[in-house]
Amino acid sequence: MCVEILGSGHRDIVNGSRFYDEQQRGLGNYFASYVYSELESLVVYAGIHVQCAGYYKMVLKRFPCSVYYKVEGDVVKVWRILDNRRDPHWVDSQL
């Protein structure tokens, strides 16, 4: 199994990193490192998470975000990493 992060997922990580750097210098790098580490865990744990709008949803523990992904054969495709504090209707519109 391998993990592929789509362009939208990379953009979400960059945007999240910028947001957290504005909150505290260095926090953005920590956010990005943590998210990439969690994405690597999908090699083992892909498919065990709750499904939402046709995507698996992995809720992150250290930041209020969720990873939305699909499993296609032996590839985990990461579509979005979205803030859980957003309006649920907005989240649905992004998927």
Predicted regions located by residue number:
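Basic, Lys/Arg-enriched alpha-helical interface segments
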Residues: 2-56, 72-75, 94-95
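Enriched for short, Lys/Arg-rich terminal
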Residues: 66, 70-95
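A short catalytic or substrate-binding loop motif that flags glycine-/basic-rich loops and adjacent residues
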Residues: 59-62
